Amino acid sequence: MAPGLPVTPAAPDGAGSAVPPVTEDTGASDTPVTPAARKKRRVLRAVGRWTAVVTVFAALGVGTAYGITTMERTDVPGLATESDGRWAYPEITRPPLPAGSPGPQDSGNWSGGHFADLRELLLPAPAGATENKALRGTDGWLPLKDFLTVFEDDEGRDAVGQQLTDYGLRHVAARGWTTEDGTRSAVYLLQFDTGTIADELYGELTGYAAPQHALRGAAETEFDEAHPTSADPAGVMRRSYDEKKPYGAEHVRQAWLRIGDTIALVVQARKGSAAAVPFQQTVVLQSQLLS
């Protein structure tokens, strides 16, 4: 599928998964980067380091988990070892801010706005993954109707579509990929005029026990208690959900984030089961890019 074409239409109720199928991408990025821009960007090393990682396997009583206690704003966690299932993400770079513009959590930024290009705040695919070109949308913006295909049924799609319209959705940027083990990932960034607006809508879309509207392939979910809050960067609101057993055609994990004027949805799905560690890693990385 070529860039700019819409995402595959939603499957009938109860069928399919919230993560769209991936089409092979062999091309380079559509957005050129000048040498001057590269010099302005802070390079966040995502391979070869976690900052202050705390292993909590025994404490949580699970096979693999992790937490982060301290982290500089310019640090993004990445691959430390291969033994715990973390993915090898490439070098991650925050785009430069316009001259004089604050970050989304700076004290002088009353609106909580992201002044960098939202499309450049999307997490890149990890090494060896195949990108879903359909999620690029048009000029990097995904049409609202295509984003709404992540929801399970027409009722959910209609309700969320009306909420996004009422709250003045500005843009949707998205990226998706499939890793070699068959795990399919999708990241959606939804931007609004202010952090206050995004915060109010975030509360309407999420709940403690489950999101307000089910994603495709995950009709029954529960709050993911195993996702450590110590991994969340300061100022990031997060609610993670796991599909209840027995799983459908795929095991679906999802996390809703709110940072400043932006709501993010991270979804991973895999036949059989979707591992917790790469999901948590992806959520933390995307949170850091938006912080």
Annotate each predicted stretch with a short phrase.
Residues 25, 30-115:
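Hydrophobic single-pass membrane-targeting/anchoring helices
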Residues 70, 193, 272:
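Short loop/turn segments at secondary-structure transitions that flank enzyme active sites
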